[in-house]
């Protein structure tokens, strides 16, 4: 069956200590690619995975992705990256406070035995000093099989600037392509604005968090709508600012209209990957409706389902019809401003 979507992102071996002493996930499939897929698969599972892994990545996980109906032929096994650590660690000290460091102390705080498989873990330095630096396990444009380059709806998860820009160039050739991009926080700084503007010309929808977009315009403006307008001047016709529990701001550049969407109210279990799940849902909604506000509502539903569970595929555990019911309810939670 042909795939409607391609998502490029990172895969990790995830160690997660959720908020409120939730059930720990130890050496489980993680990474922003999977969380975005979980949000999209609520609506449509015909997805090509674009990623890069080394030989330490469990083959049985790849088989599980295939069993779920995902196309794994875009995952490139790179034997030259076997020295790279694929582990990730996330611990919540509070519902909204997460840490990627000092795993030993976090396991002790949670009164959990420290897993031997996490020994020697060091978090990746996310500081960006040079935009030409690449992440050793980010997906690479020239590894994408040719048969996937004509897929019409593509989402790029956060990873390094160079790899993202090369993938935008790879996919933007077709007039029917819709590319959404979630920026990596490391390069959302005023010093990198000139380079970012070049990449934006090939992007349909730009999906930053409020924190990221404020960082980009630090010292220039506090007005989120002005920020969205300035970004749209360089190409993206849709700007969605993800605002966590406050919902989303949606700027429709083509119509010059602004919308505020409330977050669907749910009980928070684990916010890990909620922004990625939103982006996956957004892409599904945009493919179905070609409408930025409707697309953001699809994303909001996916985000709400993710918050209620732990693990990238938890949005798929909802009762049949739940996503559609929430989508209907959200129609009343949109306000034009």
Report each predicted region and the residues it spans.
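Conserved phosphate-binding/catalytic region of the ribokinase-like
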Residues: 2-3, 153, 221-337
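Short, hydrophobic/glycine-enriched beta-strand segments
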Residues: 2-12, 180
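Conserved N-terminal subdomain of the carbohydrate kinase-like
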Residues: 13-17, 21, 46-153, 324-337
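Short catalytic helix/loop segments, enriched in acidic residues and glycine
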Residues: 21-38
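Alpha-helix C-terminal capping segments
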Residues: 37-46, 285-288
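Short, conserved phosphate/pyrophosphate- and ester-handling motifs at nucleotide-, phospho-/glycolipid
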Residues: 40, 209, 275
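Short beta->alpha connector loops
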Residues: 54-55, 158-163, 184-189
